[in-house]
C-alpha cells in the first residue's frame, strides 16, 4: 500500500501550520520561512526501505526507514526524535517522540492528493500536496 504514496508531491495548501510550529516551539524567524516555503516531498521505496525526501529552499531532509521499526530522526526544525512510521489501512502514520513530547503526522491519499494531518497536543494543521 506504500506504493500509493510513492511519487513526487508539491505543497498546494496549508492550514494552521504556523500554530502547529508555534506549539512545537519553533522560533519566529523559522516559522516565517516555514509559512512561505512550498516544499517538494519525494516518497520512494529503495531496497526494502521507504525513503521520504523533503526539498525546499530552507532545508533538505531525508529519512530512510523500515515500516514499524523505530529510528532516529532530526526533524526539519532540528528536533532529535525517536520516530516510528507504520501503515494503518491506507494511512501512513509517523510518530515523533522527543523530550517527553510526541507529535503525529498522518499521510493519506484523497482524490489523488496527499493530505498530511499534523497533530501536537490539541493543535492540528493540514497540508495538501498534489503530484508534481
Swiss-Prot record:
Domain of life: Eukaryota
Pfam family, one: Lipocalin
GO CC annotations, alphabetized: cell periphery; cell projection; cell-cell junction; cytosol; neuronal cell body; nucleus
GO biological process: cell proliferation in forebrain; epithelial cell proliferation; fatty acid transport; neurogenesis; prepulse inhibition; startle response
PROSITE patterns in alphabetical order: FABP (PS00214)
UniProt keyword list: Acetylation, Cytoplasm, Lipid-binding, Transport
Residues engaged in binding a fatty acid: 127-129
Localisation per UniProt entry: Cytoplasm
Keyword set includes Isomerase: no
Tissue: Expressed in brain and other neural tissues.
Modified-residue entries (N-acetylvaline), positions: 2
Residues forming coiled coils: none
Keyword ATP-binding part of the UniProt annotation: no
Record GO terms (molecular function): fatty acid binding
InterPro entries per UniProt: Calycin, Fatty_acid-bd, ILBP, Lipocln_cytosolic_FA-bd_dom
Gene3D superfamilies in alphabetical order: 2.40.128.20
Ranges annotated as spanning the membrane: none
Description of its domains: Forms a beta-barrel structure that accommodates hydrophobic ligands in its interior.
Protein family membership: Belongs to the calycin superfamily. Fatty-acid binding protein (FABP) family.
Described purpose of this protein according to its UniProt entry: B-FABP could be involved in the transport of a so far unknown hydrophobic ligand with potential morphogenic activity during CNS development. It is required for the establishment of the radial glial fiber system in developing brain, a system that is necessary for the migration of immature neurons to establish cortical layers.
Protein name: Fatty acid-binding protein, brain
